[in-house]
Amino acid sequence: MPLTAYDLTGRTAFITGAASGIGRACAVLLAEAGATVHCADIDERGLNETRSLISEAGGTAHNHPLDVSERAQLKSAIEYAASTGRLDMLAAVAGIMHSSTVLETRDEDLDHVLAVNFKGILYACQESARVMIAAGTPGSIVTMASGAVDAASAGLLCYSAAKAAVVQLTRTLATELGPHSIRVNAVAPGWIRTPMTDRHDATLQQQAEAAMVRLSPLRRVGEPEDIAHTVLHLASDASSFTTGQIIRPNGGVAMPW
């Protein structure tokens, strides 16, 4: 396939969770591919660092400090991104971790995780789809699921439930938006070394990483750039016949088949 299929010159991408980790890697890579990127995150300092990385490499980035669980904030930012030309792609990456057993989980824990990890993605998809449909142009939406949708993990009820909801959202959107030439796919990463995973107990993190390395045929954990390349593929014309899929870059761990 010609490399031009991955050329995003003249296109506009909106990325949530762009202040660090997978979101930042996506923003940097899509900008390297030629896209103008609009970066959204609650962490304004991290956003500024992402924009600096993109600018220093010759790319174009715009920052939108916001809370993805607030629909009005996302709506305003996405409509602004579309007003600068058109919106071609969305990467809804923003998410949080929470650990508690089922019996320990409080209402506020579940509400907070669902607000960010599910509603935040739902809102971004809804508002992006609306402007894409209004423009009458093809588009690509990529949501961020997780390997947690394939295997139960003690202590991850809120996180796993939210990510499972994202999978069904993705499939439903793919069915509904296909007639508008808008593709919708999800990425379900395995263990990826990011600031979000680093914030958890260091000993537990080391144990989890060691376990993933043993389980992976590739004998390593993933890096944010591994996921960013998957997102680039799904955002580009190289995947023009791909929609409704859950792509699992996980080093061969937790193969559902």
Protein language model features and the residues they cover:
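C-terminal helical subdomain
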Residues: 186, 210-238, 242, 251
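A glycine/serine/threonine-rich, flexible loop-to-helix segment
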Residues: 4, 179, 191-215, 256-257
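Residue(s) in the substrate-gating loop at a strand-loop-helix junction
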Residues: 146
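Substrate-binding pocket helix/loop in short-chain dehydrogenase/reductase
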Residues: 101-102, 106-114, 212
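Alpha-helical segment proximal to the catalytic Tyr-Lys
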Residues: 130, 175-179, 240
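Short C-terminal tail/terminal secondary-structure segment
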Residues: 2-4, 151, 232, 243-257
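Active-site helix of classical SDR
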Residues: 125, 162, 170
